[in-house]
Amino acid sequence: MSKVLTSLPTGERVGIAFSGGLDTSVAVAWMRDKGAVPCTYTADIGQYDEPDIASVPDRAKTYGAEVARLVDCRAALVEEGLAALTCGAFHIRSGGRAYFNTTPLGRAVTGTLLVRAMLEDDVQIWGDGSTFKGNDIERFYRYGLLANPQLRIYKPWLDADFVTELGGRKEMSEWLVAHDLPYRDSTEKAYSTDANIWGATHEAKTLEHLDTGVETVEPIMGVRFWDPSVEIAPEDVTIGFDQGRPVTINGKEFASAVDLVMEANAVGGRHGMGMSDQIENRIIEAKSRGIYEAPGMALLHAAYERLVNAIHNEDTLAQYHTEGRRLGRLMYEGRWLDPQSLMIRESLQRWVGSAVTGEVTLRLRRGEDYSILDTTGPAFSYHPDKLSMERTEDSAFGPVDRIGQLTMRNLDIADSRAKLEQYAGLGLIGTANPAIGAAQAAATGLIGAMPEGGAQAIASRGEVSADDELLDRAAMESGTD
């Protein structure tokens, strides 16, 4: 049975995620006028686009809200963001710049905590401002039902009566004026902005056109680093981690993780760090474009991954990146609390993050232009003396050891040579006219003639001494692999 209502449930309490903007304000007033009982819930997520979040519930009451609550979600959002940082749960990357999934993080927290707050007031119907074309409608749907299995969903923007009467900003403002309700006649921006303590998303309207660049966006968490008239002095900053968590900035400890993130935002923001322009695949696989800010997360991420690379081996790093990317996509789809996500999170936090302790000092300049000045920690796998070109004592291995290691490589090199000889015989390589077609042929500029027998020559040990021959036979007779 569908959980989504397509008409207003008159006489019932309807919870609305209330931002205080025109859309949600007119929705509350319209629902009250048509006989429903609107109850508003505003999430304090440290949003940088709302300077007076504490006043929002009173605004909701002006429009007819029966209940108007402010729910402090900052601590929970910071904790989920730190988990994402530890796991590298960021799958959207382009040209070396990442989107740090700041909006999906916010939806996981608000979609859960607001519905839990509604339950306390016996509100079993929930609505928000997400549209049917975007990601948020599915994210909120999933998190809402996880928090309250009995939840029903009513979105005014899916109600034909609401859309017919109030289909645009002009109609909404005229409706409020006609009903003697306040309307803040703010200038409509050229794009839409959504923000929380971890970052800001700018999208839609003019930004839907790819010939409109990032420089048309006015940062709300940082500075216009691309503008030469904006003076940005270089700054050195040291980030300290303990078991995968950032704990200090320039040696200073903070009363709460929220305070640390605010300071990271301030430091990264004054250099324009963490701003990226991304084309991404929405949940429904349609492509969209967003311009993102995340100065604090970008700063912490740069320091964290420096330590990760100094501490963990190659296979662990590969798993970290592969599973982190998968976890990022799951979060993007609204599956941050699903079992498969919890499994990946637990693994990465336990086996990758717990070992990450140390400090990284960076020199920040403009945007992503920074240098790493120092990296220290108690348990690095990086040991410069082991690979030094100078004479060292207690070296891990010597020339003879490396000769033996190279000799062991003969087996797989011989196997590769045998395959190349086979491909040459088929006309796949070593010729300008591949027999099976150019689309199936690899680049062959480095490969010349491939006479047979090369593989055997590589794998052969040549003449061996009598002692080595005896050892080989002994190993075979004893069944040793």
From Swiss-Prot:
Pathway(s) this gene product operates in, as recorded in its UniProt entry: Amino-acid biosynthesis; L-arginine biosynthesis; L-arginine from L-ornithine and carbamoyl phosphate: step 2/3
Binding sites annotated in the UniProt record for L-aspartate: T131, N135, D136
Localization annotation: Cytoplasm
Pfam families: Arginosuc_syn_C, Arginosuc_synth
A GO CC term assigned to this protein in UniProt: cytoplasm
Entry's family note: Belongs to the argininosuccinate synthase family. Type 2 subfamily.
Protein name per Swiss-Prot or TrEMBL: Argininosuccinate synthase
Species of the source: Streptomyces coelicolor (strain ATCC BAA-471 / A3(2) / M145)
Taxonomic lineage of the native organism: Bacteria, Bacillati, Actinomycetota, Actinomycetes, Kitasatosporales
